[in-house]
Amino acid sequence: MANEVFNSSLFVIGTYLFLGTLYLVFIPLGLYFWMNTRWNYMGKIERLLIYSLVFLFFPGLILFAPFLNLRMNGQGDV
């Protein structure tokens, strides 16, 4: 009985860690990559979808904001 509770607790903790990592790390990084490559070529519907995903995954995006630069190439002095 105690072993079942321990195993189910580990499963729940592992699931929370997996979903938290997915929400805070992997999906925001994929979203940054998508925005960086498609920013100048997006249509209206795609841009609306991206804006809604930015709203949904804002906590993860704000974690990576200090480390990523989304300025266009060729801006500024060399």
From Swiss-Prot:
Cellular localisation: Cellular thylakoid membrane
Pfam families on file: NdhL
GO cellular component, one term: plasma membrane-derived thylakoid membrane
Signal peptide extent: none
Catalytic activity: a plastoquinone + NADH + (n+1) H(+)(in) = a plastoquinol + NAD(+) + n H(+)(out); a plastoquinone + NADPH + (n+1) H(+)(in) = a plastoquinol + NADP(+) + n H(+)(out)
Gene Ontology molecular functions: oxidoreductase activity, acting on NAD(P)H, quinone or similar compound as acceptor; quinone binding
Superkingdom of origin: Bacteria
Membrane disposition: Multi-pass membrane protein
Main location class: membrane
Disulfide bonding pattern of the chain: none
Known EC number: 7.1.1.-
Record keywords: Membrane, NAD, NADP, Plastoquinone, Quinone, Thylakoid, Translocase, Transmembrane, Transmembrane helix, Transport
Segments crossing the lipid bilayer: 10-30, 48-68
Function: NDH-1 shuttles electrons from an unknown electron donor, via FMN and iron-sulfur (Fe-S) centers, to quinones in the respiratory and/or the photosynthetic chain. The immediate electron acceptor for the enzyme in this species is believed to be plastoquinone. Couples the redox reaction to proton translocation, and thus conserves the redox energy in a proton gradient. Cyanobacterial NDH-1 also plays a role in inorganic carbon-concentration.
Family under the similarity heading: Belongs to the complex I NdhL subunit family.
Subunit: NDH-1 can be composed of about 15 different subunits; different subcomplexes with different compositions have been identified which probably have different functions.
Name of this protein: NAD(P)H-quinone oxidoreductase subunit L
Organism this protein belongs to: Prochlorococcus marinus (strain SARG / CCMP1375 / SS120)
Lineage of source species: Bacteria, Bacillati, Cyanobacteriota, Cyanophyceae, Synechococcales
